[in-house]
């Protein structure tokens, strides 16, 4: 009897090859063309409030946002943009600013040339750039100004503000078809066409392909996946991914991660934003952290050292285990802005914080440095492993502080200016 063939993962398992797109330079950041997938974010301050906006852009940049979008919705906001750019430059923050325009972008960019110059990219929504006879004229004005100042644009269609004239046309054509599609499929087609037709018009006006980025955002995960698959199949423009109106808390994180994770695995996407509704008084930088963690978890980029920790169960002394895992995670994220320049390569560090002897020693050996805490009923001793080898055993009430000190020492010796080879990190017990 023949044995059935068993399908297994191989050492070549991974995402599909990246969809080949045209590289676009947004300030000093490359988007598309095989460049690393870029993390971006958006402020929620009143852009006219220069001080608050500068503070939030700075916080987002420190958290790791590589581009930051700001709303430019009225004259006071447009007038503030060059001052925001100036204040950021004085702080040494070179993160490109993207102007988000709706309805009157053509007028603001015309009337405030310093704003047009200070921004690194203009975001245009083809669904509300203008209405009826004014739409083409106002869209053309923005493209001509982008050409004048040498700025790229993102043409971003959105489910909630879709070009109704185009949608009505496609709905009528669908109704007359012998094999009509459902309304959602027609709406998805309108999204794709809105972006592609606008991009084609921009090129007719002299905008080169290497200054055009496209997006087509919806709030339903399956629709978003279908829209972006279609958009990628029909063009080679650089692509911005994002799930609009994802929501707050775990719902928003899960929805965005599910949608973007599938598309990224298929090789689609050159820059991403995780659009989260912040909790009242919440930290705006959470969206940056989630975007980084998504890319790092999937193996596309590394931003911070990875802390692996078991979920905990009845075998673990939960308080000690949880406190140490949280302490190490928070410490690493807080220190990363300084570590980036002081310890090149530290983002590749793997740390393991395990809760008991079942999987703890094995997982700790796979990390650069790991600890297996004593579980419930076990001896109060925690073996530490460095680069796969038993290093020493920590005991007593200061296990957490002692392990943190060992992590700091390991980072300094492994990634500091006088870095030693892994096996020379000092003195096992």
From Swiss-Prot:
Pathway: Isoprenoid biosynthesis; isopentenyl diphosphate biosynthesis via DXP pathway; isopentenyl diphosphate from 1-deoxy-D-xylulose 5-phosphate: step 5/6
EC number(s) per entry: 1.17.7.3
Pfam families in the record: GcpE
Chemical reaction(s) catalysed: (2E)-4-hydroxy-3-methylbut-2-enyl diphosphate + oxidized [flavodoxin] + H2O + 2 H(+) = 2-C-methyl-D-erythritol 2,4-cyclic diphosphate + reduced [flavodoxin]
Cofactor field: [4Fe-4S] cluster
Superkingdom assignment: Bacteria
Cofactor details (free text): Binds 1 [4Fe-4S] cluster.
The protein's enzyme class: oxidoreductase
BP terms from Gene Ontology: isopentenyl diphosphate biosynthetic process, methylerythritol 4-phosphate pathway; terpenoid biosynthetic process
Binding site for [4Fe-4S] cluster: 310, 313, 356, 363
Keyword tags: 4Fe-4S, Iron, Iron-sulfur, Isoprene biosynthesis, Metal-binding, Oxidoreductase
Keyword 4Fe-4S: yes
Recorded GO MF terms: 4 iron, 4 sulfur cluster binding; 4-hydroxy-3-methylbut-2-en-1-yl diphosphate synthase activity (ferredoxin); 4-hydroxy-3-methylbut-2-enyl-diphosphate synthase activity (flavodoxin); iron ion binding
Similarity annotation: Belongs to the IspG family.
Protein role: Converts 2C-methyl-D-erythritol 2,4-cyclodiphosphate (ME-2,4cPP) into 1-hydroxy-2-methyl-2-(E)-butenyl 4-diphosphate.
Entry-linked HAMAP family: IspG
PANTHER family given in the database record: 4-HYDROXY-3-METHYLBUT-2-EN-1-YL DIPHOSPHATE SYNTHASE, 4-HYDROXY-3-METHYLBUT-2-EN-1-YL DIPHOSPHATE SYNTHASE (FERREDOXIN), CHLOROPLASTIC
Protein name as annotated: 4-hydroxy-3-methylbut-2-en-1-yl diphosphate synthase (flavodoxin)
Species name: Bradyrhizobium sp. (strain BTAi1 / ATCC BAA-1182)
